[in-house]
A protein has these predicted regions:
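Bacterial N-terminal signal peptides that target proteins for export
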Residues: 1-21
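Bacterial N-terminal signal peptides
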Residues: 18-31
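Short, histidine-centered active-site or binding-site loop motifs used for metal coordination
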Residues: 49-52, 84, 171-172
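Boundary at the C-terminal end of the N-terminal hydrophobic targeting segment
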Residues: 33-35
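Alpha-helical cap/lid subdomain in secreted, periplasmic
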Residues: 14, 39-41, 61, 65-77, ...
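Catalytic nucleophile-elbow at a beta strand-turn-alpha helix junction centered on a G-D-S/GDSL motif
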Residues: 43-58, 89, 118
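A structural signal for the hydrophobic beta-strands that form the central parallel beta-sheet
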Residues: 47-48, 82, 167, 226
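Short beta->alpha junction loops
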Residues: 82-89
Length: 297
């Protein structure tokens, strides 16, 4: 009888063991381990940046619009605060931080900065003091500070004001990844990654995402993500938006919902581009009809 009881117990235990993988899968499934979307309905998100960010709002299918639509598709009704200005560098963003961002009292701020700091060459912003003394920059370089100090100040001031920053690495300067400009940009992005880690700031490593996509496409003569090597085309805007949404905590299923909301914006973007082209053609025609201004004696 005792032997029979032991055999029965062993059989039951072995039967239970068969269900352990199912139980484990249930416990560690992504639905259980995935954190909630960090942004909540009613919160404001400031998008601080340069022309890439300005276009990200001005274009109906720009990355700022796509991020907003993607959150909406997942039930998060956040208010975007566009704060991108064409040509701006880190010193200019720092100078207008209070007016364009902090005064609006957002809960979040994405920071996209670095392309112009490098791309503007002698008029750019050096990474650090050593670079400032390299002889590369014009006589006004001291007034622009350094990228490291400017970015750190932006993050610290935002945090002190209760704003949660999200760091975006600067996107490519030319889709030729071996370009001189991309080489110069590399230490700037390395600094951003380091600072985000030190301050425990969410990050969208957009440069790494762009690099991976450009290499995968392997089309040296085709602009894959940009219209001119710097500013985004439709695919570039979508990739930027995906990076930002991931930084906000969206999982793959939530990203799929976000992407499903984008085609309507892309249709609007086509119409927007058409109207812009018509306006440019009209302006050019009017200019051609006009008489040149008289030369000064």
């Amino acid at each position: 009888l005792k032997v029979a009881a032991r055999l029965l117990a062993l059989t039951m235990n072995m039967h239970a063991l068969r269900f352990l993988p199912v139980l484990a899968a249930t416990i560690i499934t992504p639905a259980f381990i995935h954190a909630e979307i960090a942004v909540k309905s009613g919160e404001k998100i400031a998008f601080l940046g340069d022309s890439i960010t300005a276009g990200g709002w001005g274009n109906p299918a720009g990355y700022v619009r796509l991020v907003s639509a993607g959150l909406e598709a997942n039930g998060v009704h956040a208010e975007p605060i566009p704060a991108g200005i064409s040509g701006h560098k880190s010193d200019q963003m720092l100078a207008r931080l209070d007016k364009d961002v902090l005064s609006k009292k957002p809960q979040w701020m994405t920071l996209s900065c670095g392309v112009n700091d490098v791309w503007h060459g002698p008029r750019g912003v050096p990474l650090d003091e050593a670079m400032a003394k390299s002889g590369t920059y014009d006589e006004k370089v001291a007034s622009r500070g350094t990228y490291k100090k400017n970015i750190t100040a932006i993050i610290d001031q935002a945090t002190a004001a209760g704003v949660k920053p999200v760091m975006l690495t600067a996107t490519v300067i030319q889709e030729n990844l071996a370009s001189k400009e991309n080489g110069l940009l590399a230490p700037y992005n390395a600094f951003l990654r380091q600072l985000a880690k030190e301050k425990n700031i969410p990050m969208a490593d957009l440069y790494a995402m762009f690099e991976k996509r450009i290499k995968a496409e392997n089309k040296p003569t085709v602009k894959v993500l940009t219209s001119d090597g710097v500013h985004m085309n439709g695919e570039g805007n979508k990739l930027m938006a995906i990076g930002v949404l991931k930084a906000f905590g969206l999982n793959e299923a939530e990203l799929d919902k976000a992407k499903a909301s984008w085609p309507a914006l892309e249709v609007a973007a086509v119409e927007f581009a058409k109207k812009q082209a018509e306006a440019r053609a009209k302006a050019a025609a009017e200019k051609a009809k006009g008489t040149p201004a008289p030369k000064k004696k």
